[in-house]
Amino acid sequence: MTKSTIDMFKNDVRYRDRIAHVETIPARKASYKKVDNLNPKIVDYLKSKNAKLYKHQSETYEAIQNDENVIITTPTASGKTLAFNLPIMETMIEDEDATALYIYPAKALSNDQLHVLENLEKSLDIKINPNTYDGDTPKSKRYDIRQKSRIILTNPYQLHLILSWHHQWKRFYSNLKFIVIDESHYYKGIFGSNVAYLIRRLKRIANFYGANPQFILSSATLANPLELANRLTGEKFRLVDNDTSPSGEKDFILYESFTFGGQTVSSFIRQSETEIAFTC
């Protein structure tokens, strides 16, 4: 938010008496950390993108390398997805039979991740055949997905249906290395309880086929991330919650008004094109 916008609110008689609080969060520089013994393909990928791993990404990477279950709760746009995708890709490179299951609460989210995985597959020159497997997956494609895909993206509703047919998934379950539960803050209340039982069924089936997959949870900021992760999966977790990505300076005005309407919003627009107003 520009200084002129803040000054306008502080000085204009129409607004100044309704300002509850003004807060400025200073800019933050990125903090990086190198991961030792990266697979050469991962090293080449990062070089091709002219990218370095933030410290929280490296901590996530190292925890996954050390066979720990991880929950990462850094903010949106901090690189959570890359933090867990790269170590999973490294396992896929080094173990050609390894598989991973990504669970999303909404179809749109899984489609977004599918595009990310397809780009990684191409960039790393590996064969993982990522696919979504849900209610919209054509029956004509389901057999090939079960037999050939190394990363499958699904949702709790579809997972509930396919667990009973686990004999059709023997190849996938017997090589299952990772279970990724993204947007895990969705799983609360009755829905969360049902998904927790579903995850326990999934674990039992994976164990039946000789697999003991790692869990990777990604979430928005939570008050009790370790408790959520444990209740959802029954496992112990390593928490990564310190955001080390760069951030610009941010200004917040908490404004008390029962008539926060067109006039106030138009004042924002006249001052700058970069402000966002939240009303409730």
Predicted regions and their residues:
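Conserved helix/coil segment N-terminal to the catalytic DExD/H
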Residues: 135-177
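Conserved interdomain linker/interface between the two RecA-like ATPase lobes of SF2 helicase motors
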Residues: 218, 222, 226-280
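Post-DEXD/H (motif II) to motif III coupling segment of the RecA-like Helicase ATP-binding lobe
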Residues: 185-245
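Conserved ATPase-coupling elements of RecA-like P-loop NTPase cores
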Residues: 113-114, 161-167, 183-198
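Conserved SF1/SF2 helicase motif Ia
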Residues: 90-113, 207-211
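Conserved helix-turn-beta segment of the N-terminal RecA-like "Helicase ATP-binding" lobe
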Residues: 109-134, 231-237
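Helicase-associated low-complexity/disordered flanking segments
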Residues: 1-59, 66-69, 128
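Walker A/P-loop NTP-binding motif
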Residues: 62-66, 81-96, 200-203
